[in-house]
Amino acid sequence: MLEVGHFQVHRLGQVAPVHKALLKAERATPAHALEQLTEVVPGKPAARRFKEDKPMLTRVTGAQAAAVIAALGSYREMLEPQRRHLLSLYRPVDVAFKVVGTGSVGLRDYCIYFEGNGPADPLFLQVKEEPDSAYSPYLPDATPPKHNGRRVAEGQKAMQLQSDPFLGWTSFGGRDYLVRQLNDHKGSIDLDDLCGDGLAAYAEVCGELLARGHARSADPLVLAGYIGAGDGFGEALAKFGAAYADQTEKDWNELKTSGKAGK
């Protein structure tokens, strides 16, 4: 399975848009984030802390920071023994509150800065609040998960060939949280830079990765039988995608109109 995964990454890496994103992801390490996210503590040249960038990143202290750190206790217990040992080699240094993307507006998102063998050995963990699934209102008969952070973490592990070794969950303040590394080897592709063959290649890669993820988390034979050998499934996806794009443009125009009207 690992050999298949390595081959897949190598093959997809030959696609120009993906190759550029992979190069960027290779540089997205904790050591690289150290200079971006932290600063030297004034008067203490050997110590570092989060570098505030309000409102995007704000340091958290006192009882709030203590609550976040305390929540790591239950998180450690759910990690595999080797991961738990690795985490024990790091100590928490600072905590910050991070403004998250549009899909998580209004949710709590914390970052914890750890140090291992000094400032040159950093680790950044993200503790992100996870609400109920967006599907839950439409699935009244489904058994609700006991923990939304666990739901997301186990879903990622099921769909990804290799997931974040520090992926896990915790709870505090009556809320469920997902725990993962912050920006560890993450990369993205700017769609504005794509056109023609590049855009088609990118769409093909996205479709393949989505299909592989579903095949890993479900029964691939059942999925293949449901899809069949004809063009019906592909045509249905294309129709849905076009309708979704139209709805997105409509929503965006209504949002702009509301903004101009002061609503």
Question: Which residue stretches match the model-derived regions?
Answer:
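Conserved ATP-binding subdomain of kinase catalytic cores across diverse folds
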Residues: 1-28, 75-263
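Contiguous mid-protein beta-loop-alpha structural module that forms a pocket-lining wall or clamp
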Residues: 1-61
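Ordered core of a single globular domain
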Residues: 40-93
